[in-house]
């Protein structure tokens, strides 16, 4: 309770003596406001806005009977005080209303509308909550047990594919080799005069003594055993194609290669189908365009390019693009070292050195951008994917140089003009079109990408969510499968499971093209951005392994 303020002694100095003689026993006032309406309003302890009649009665009770009227000097001081308070209050209200407006101005341009600076910072903080799993303790015994089971399943899968490959190439009889018909045609052309009509069918038939015991394309088990086995994946934003399980073989005896796809229907039924037929292939882009693939071109992280029109077994979604890009994710290093030691290759360093120089240029640009993306990588990379998808009107993934320059400005990513020109020349050499570049290749080249070990867990997490193998996952399924029980903030009691789950879904949905579903490309971009801020591979794997229970 505020003690009563006695204003009876506030009089002019000239009248102080006269006022001191006034009987103070009659003064039972708490506050006596002036007759004029005050600027800020006087609020009495008993005043209520909904009872005006009661207010008048209270005012009449507290007015002293013999209080002298204020002098002109006192009235002037009061008016000055009231005007100063009124002006100060107006300035305070004006400042408080201007601060939220300044904070709510959008930072990005037309493609990043509707997000204020505070909102963007909030989304970044919520995305960084996922990095808490990196420090979460996880049972080593459980990890070892699961990895052992997974290793056995992978070895069994590779053995099945290798057996099918051997059967396909050894079961074909030499007598039915197409090369036998070529020999017959050459013999016919030497027998039949040029001016005569085409020889009858009986002449064109191949007899037994004209059949070769072995053709150039005939293979033996010894030839097929000199091989390097590798795992691969399709570089595509189409989730169904990106998650295909591919196993390839590079044969040292003729520098040829083939790729098979391992399919699983349900829990027990499997199928092994040829994906890329066995043949000798050449680079389709880059500094080595037109040169034949060699043993030195096969390593973890290498990208193999093929013309999609030359592969009859490819699905329609892949044939829509002129080039098929295949990334080697894992390789049999023991077999690779053995074949390299057996075949002393020459000139390999000279062939690789220009590409190594290109990698150094790209690495320098990537290091500069990673500093800018350290805290906000998830939001920017997913936002860029959505931005490029909106510009891709034809649906082939190809964009022009001006589109990429505008994208960097839109997302406030600083790249010098000299660095961008060097980067663009390198990227054009790796593309199939002259003036346009695939925006997926652009992102991989300018920002870099996580290593294949990390990427394998991203694919595992998405494949676990994609029950129907469509390449698209609904937000409802993500909410059902995401588990936040082992998040450090949940264990310590600072957050609930629902809060961690909601923050993850909010940051993921905020940058997706559709609010109720997430594509593989968007899912990959999200974790690609998180990967920038995580140094250790095992720490990043925990971010995926713990909530998705991989």
UniProtKB/Swiss-Prot annotation:
Coiled coil residues, start to end? none
Q: Where is the composition biased (Polar residues)?
A: 181-190
Keywords on record: Calcium, Metal-binding, Repeat
Cited SUPFAM superfamilies: EF-hand
Keyword Plastid part of the UniProt annotation: no
Top-level lineage group: Eukaryota
Asked if the Swiss-Prot or TrEMBL record annotates the protein with the keyword Magnesium, the reply is no
EF-hand domain boundaries = 379-414, 415-452, 453-488
Show which residues constitute the signal peptide.
none
Region feature Disordered, mapped onto this chain:
1-20, 175-198
Gene Ontology molecular function terms on file: calcium ion binding
Q: Which residues bind Ca(2+)?
A: 466, 468, 470, 477
InterPro entries from the entry?
Ca-bind_SignalingProt (IPR051581), EF-hand-dom_pair (IPR011992), EF_Hand_1_Ca_BS (IPR018247), EF_hand_dom (IPR002048)
State what protein this is by name. Answer: Calcyphosin-2
């Amino acid at each position: 309770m505020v003690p009563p303020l006695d204003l009876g002694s506030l009089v002019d100095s000239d009248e102080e003596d006269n006022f001191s003689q006034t009987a103070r026993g009659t003064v039972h006032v708490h506050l006596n406001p002036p007759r004029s309406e005050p600027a800020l309003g006087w609020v009495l302890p008993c005043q209520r806005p909904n009872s005006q009649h009661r207010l008048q009665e209270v005012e009449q009770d507290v007015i002293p009977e013999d209080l002298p009227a204020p002098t002109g000097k006192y009235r002037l001081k009061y008016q000055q005080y009231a005007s100063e308070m009124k002006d100060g209050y107006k300035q305070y209200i004006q400042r408080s209303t201007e601060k939220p407006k300044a904070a709510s101005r959008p930072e990005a341009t037309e493609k990043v509308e509707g997000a204020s600076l505070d909102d963007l910072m909030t989304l970044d903080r919520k995305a960084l909550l996922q990095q808490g799993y990196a420090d979460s303790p996880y049972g080593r015994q459980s990890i070892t047990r699961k990895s052992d089971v997974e290793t056995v399943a992978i070895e069994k899968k590779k053995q099945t594919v290798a057996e099918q490959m051997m059967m396909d190439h050894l079961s074909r009889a030499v007598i039915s080799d197409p090369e036998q018909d070529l020999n017959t045609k050459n013999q016919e052309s030497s027998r039949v005069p040029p001016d005569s009509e085409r020889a009858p069918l009986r002449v064109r038939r191949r007899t037994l003594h004209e059949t070769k015991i072995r053709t150039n394309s005939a293979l033996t088990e010894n030839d097929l055993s000199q091989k390097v086995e590798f795992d691969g994946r399709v570089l595509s934003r189409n989730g169904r194609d990106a998650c295909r399980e591919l196993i390839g073989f590079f044969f040292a005896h003729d520098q040829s290669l083939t790729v098979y796809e391992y399919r699983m229907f349900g829990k027990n039924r499997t199928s092994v189908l040829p994906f890329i037929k066995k043949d000798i292939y050449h680079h389709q882009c880059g500094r080595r365009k037109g040169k034949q693939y060699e043993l030195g071109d096969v390593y973890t992280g290498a990208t193999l390019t093929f013309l999609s029109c030359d592969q009859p077994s490819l699905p329609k979604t892949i044939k829509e693009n002129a080039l098929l890009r295949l990334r080697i994710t894992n390789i049999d290093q023991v077999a690779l070292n053995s074949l390299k030691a057996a075949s002393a290759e020459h000139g390999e360093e000279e062939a690789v050195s220009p590409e190594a120089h290109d990698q150094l240029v790209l690495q320098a640009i990537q290091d500069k951008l990673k500093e800018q993306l350290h805290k906000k990588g998830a939001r920017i990379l997913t936002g860029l994917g959505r931005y490029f998808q909106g510009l891709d009107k034809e649906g082939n993934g190809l964009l022009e140089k001006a589109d990429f320059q505008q994208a960097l400005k839109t997302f406030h990513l600083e790249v010098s003009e000299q660095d961008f020109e060097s980067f663009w020349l390198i990227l054009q050499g790796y593309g199939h079109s002259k003036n346009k570049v695939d925006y997926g290749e652009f992102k991989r080249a300018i920002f870099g990408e996580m290593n294949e070990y990390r990427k394998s867990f991203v694919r595992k997490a998405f494949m676990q969510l994609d029950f129907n193998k469509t390449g698209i996952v609904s937000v409802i399924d993500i909410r059902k499968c995401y588990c936040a029980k082992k998040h450090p903030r949940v264990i310590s009691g600072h957050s609930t499971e629902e809060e961690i789950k909601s923050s993850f879904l909010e940051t993921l949905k905020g940058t997706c093209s559709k609010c109720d579903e997430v594509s593989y490309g968007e899912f990959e971009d999200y974790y690609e951005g998180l990967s920038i801020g995580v140094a250790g591979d095992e720490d990043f794997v925990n971010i995926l392994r713990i909530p998705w229970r991989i």
